[in-house]
Amino acid sequence: MSVLDENVPIFKYFEEISKIPHGSFHEEKIADYVESFAKEHNFKYVRDDMNNVIIYKNATPGYENHDTVMLQAHMDMVCEKNKDVDFDFETDALNLYVEDGWLKAKGTTLGADDGFGVSYMLAILSDDTLKHPNLECVFTVQEEVGLLGSINLKKEYFNAKKMIGLDGGGEVSTCTTTSGGRYAYVDKTCA
């Protein structure tokens, strides 16, 4: 039984991916799902050795000469559970429920970071009524453990000069734009 309104594409896709284990370093099954989605919709796509998936959608008529836009979200989630919960993030589906208007997962993290970003892209890709330029939808892996998927992407996969990063943030937002990530390491000798 569905917890969310399946008539709303983003909710439908979020609920579907919540059934697929997708912790960091274990994104194969969700990458399979995204690849199957691309095949089902006859989109050109690339899946690399790390399981990053890039789906390409052609511009709608009248938008062919606009700059290509990249949308990006990561497929892995933070895997945390309550101490009293028996749950295996490599095999078990999340158990979603709504309480007082809030979507939650029983005894575990929800996976909204970045499951909603992934769901947004799938909803955008599946909607043939949206007007848009060429799209490069980038589904990365291993973001939660150091942006490893995005660091290893090959530049020849992309033509976009504009990017919108889709990642959750804050108590009431479901989608924010981000400017990418960067790590800085500092060594300091202490006396």
Which ranges hold each PLM region?
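Short amphipathic alpha-helical surface micro-motifs
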Residues: E35-K39, N51, V118-M121, E144-L148, ...
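A generic local structural motif
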Residues: H41, Y56-N58, I124, G149-N152
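Generic marker of residues within folded, mature protein domains
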Residues: Y45, P61, D127, T176-T178
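Histidine/acidic-residue-rich, glycine-tolerant segments that coordinate divalent metal ions
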Residues: I55, H132-A191
